[in-house]
Amino acid sequence: MQIIVPASSANLGPGFDSIGVALSLLLTVDVLGPATSWQVDHQLADLPHDESNLIVQTARQLVPDLTPHHLAVQSDIPVAHGLGSSSSAIVAGIELANQLGALHLSNEQKVAFACQLEGHPDNVAPTILGGLVIGTEVNGGFAAVKAPLPPYLFAAYIPAYNVKTKEARAALPTTLPFKEAVAASATANTLVAALFTGDYQLVGQLIEQDRFHEQARAHLVPELTQLRELGHRCGALATYLSGAGPTVMTLLKEADFPAFQAAITQAGLPGRLVPLTPHPTGVTVS
């Protein structure tokens, strides 16, 4: 059995902790068979190979007496780079328990459990459902709605350094002035409306008007402003900080990608630029 889980990019600017998109970097888990104890083969630095691995931990939260198995894990998703690596591992663990434990979970149940672990749906919901998803907590549960996908390439600038989510969370303000909070909420609301109506000129403007987190985290990702300027010169729709960073995501037409890549090289920015596409289906099992 093979479980494939996409990466994800959260926030899309002002959609803090509520908007996310599944992307074409993949986490693959091959279930090789039962074993006397959990064995997780992988080549990812500083991640455990036994039952303390996040994939196994998550599966055992759903089914505590799950039979140990030998797993082989491969991942294109860089750890601690704002591309949902931990969320993808959590979703892989949920699907592992679902399959081995014959739980027959619905997507809604998977999203609910994943959100309980993560605390918010912006990464886990698109990872499960695929595409672009908007969600929030409602009356103790979680609601998630799929939105139309923007017809753009997601160009991920991935720096060599990482940013731990805990560090990025610590940079956030504990409160916002009421007037600022109203403006931030209105921007996010209008972004959602523009996504559903396909007004992508407005989408591009609103993605770059975040008031919740990007300014507070700018010192952690100093390339953000320069990448946004380079993107504008190359015809990009918008640039935003992916999740907690440090990955910076730029939406642009596929034809504009070579010019954007050349501009980054000319500017001497050392990170990798990776062209990504939305992953339409989310987690799959074969």
From Swiss-Prot:
Subcellular location: Cytoplasm
This protein's record includes keyword rRNA processing: no
Reaction(s) catalysed (UniProt annotation): L-homoserine + ATP = O-phospho-L-homoserine + ADP + H(+)
GO biological process, one term: threonine biosynthetic process
Binding positions for ATP per the UniProt entry: 78-88
GO cellular component: cytoplasm
Involved pathway(s): Amino-acid biosynthesis; L-threonine biosynthesis; L-threonine from L-aspartate: step 4/5
Domain of life: Bacteria
Claim: Secreted is one of the keywords in the record: no
Family assignment from sequence similarity: Belongs to the GHMP kinase family. Homoserine kinase subfamily.
Functional summary from the UniProt entry: Catalyzes the ATP-dependent phosphorylation of L-homoserine to L-homoserine phosphate.
NCBIfam families listed in its UniProt record: thrB
UniProt name for this protein: Homoserine kinase
